[in-house]
Amino acid sequence: GTVEEMDQYINFADQWKDAEGNSYGIGYMGNAQGLLYNKAVFEAAGVTELPKTPDELIAALQAIKDNTDAIPLYTNYAAGWTMGGQWDAFLGAITTGDETWLNQKFVHTAEPFADNGDGTGAYALYKILYDAVAQGLIEDDYTTTDWEGCKAMINNGEIGCMVLGSWAISQMKE
């Protein structure tokens, strides 16, 4: 149908049109990427403010390790999709400030994973994960993680946080 026809039912329909004003698809959800965390675990570790920088996040994870029995950062590595899909979702505008970087510039960048030296880009993102692993701030055996089991674990205070999107909140509440 035309964008004008859809506009009365769908927000932002004008953003889903071709040059002739036709739309061939409808977005069905929105998602915010971030850290899903257990507030009680962070508080028990003495972390009273959410981390705002990579260094603050690593420090918070270390505090969880030092002051609780919880796994600071649960990677869900064995599931596979939780590593690529969730971490990679931060690439682009979130890590570079450039909304065109991932879909238009990434493939034309000579060294897209190089350290930009300013805390931005793919290197900075994956360095967070590298540092967490190197410092023992993830599960002991990441090859045996359990996606379904982690839902109860975070609710029971056995996990500090996980990199997930807002879509996961309802699953963790179940």
Regions found by a protein language model. Name each.
Residues 24-25, 66-78:
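Bilobed periplasmic-binding protein-like "clamshell/Venus-flytrap" ligand-binding domains
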Residues 86, 127-174:
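Extracytoplasmic/periplasmic substrate-binding proteins
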Residues 61-63, 106-142:
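Glycine-centered hinge/linker elements that transmit conformational signals in sensory
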Residues 1-32, 97:
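Hinge/lid segment of periplasmic solute-binding proteins
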Residues 1-9, 40-52, 153, 160-161, ...:
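Extracytoplasmic "Venus flytrap"/periplasmic binding protein-like
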Residues 33-37:
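Short glycine- and hydrophobic/aromatic-rich loop-to-beta-strand nucleating segment
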